[in-house]
Amino acid sequence: MSDSQMVIDLDVQVAVEGFELPSQAELELWVKTALRDTMSEAELTIRIVDVEESQELNMTYRGKDKPTNVLSFPFEAPPGIELPLLGDLVICAAVVEQEAIDQNKPLLAHWAHMVVHGCLHLLGYDHIEDVEAEEMESLETQLIESLGYINPYKEQ
């Protein structure tokens, strides 16, 4: 399915100030790219947060007392009910910005990577086991490169 045929209902919530953030159009493009081979219609929320909210959510849901770049909260519909609701992504602007600096990556490219990475988690991909990590990283690389950015796992 082409990106233009896909219907995305993207709710963007910005709960942080003072950061260079991607536009709604950029976020939608990245979501469509991540989902293009799997869904024709999707609803999701991207919430962009500060360090405190990210750390609190990471502690509550993952038991890690530190902020993180992206958290994924997939929606699971009850059996027999089909909804296009994919779930929620929570992205910490400060962590994304610092990682881009530390990894010597363009900020927009790193934002694209985090959105694609989070969407793949919403689709059920994971990187806990090595085999899963290789599969997920390979797919992420293909998707990110299709957007015109370089391999996010290549050393800069």
From Swiss-Prot:
Essential cofactor(s): Zn(2+)
Cofactor note as given: Binds 1 zinc ion.
Residues binding Zn(2+): H117, H121, H127
One Pfam family, short name: YbeY
Keywords from the named record: Cytoplasm, Endonuclease, Hydrolase, Metal-binding, Nuclease, Ribosome biogenesis, rRNA processing, Zinc
UniProt-listed GO biological process terms: rRNA processing
GO cellular component, one term: cytoplasm
GO MF terms held by the record: metalloendopeptidase activity; RNA endonuclease activity; zinc ion binding
Places the protein is found: Cytoplasm
Its EC number(s): 3.1.-.-
SUPFAM superfamilies on file: Metalloproteases ('zincins'), catalytic domain (SSF55486)
Protein family: Belongs to the endoribonuclease YbeY family.
Known role: Single strand-specific metallo-endoribonuclease involved in late-stage 70S ribosome quality control and in maturation of the 3' terminus of the 16S rRNA.
Protein name: Endoribonuclease YbeY
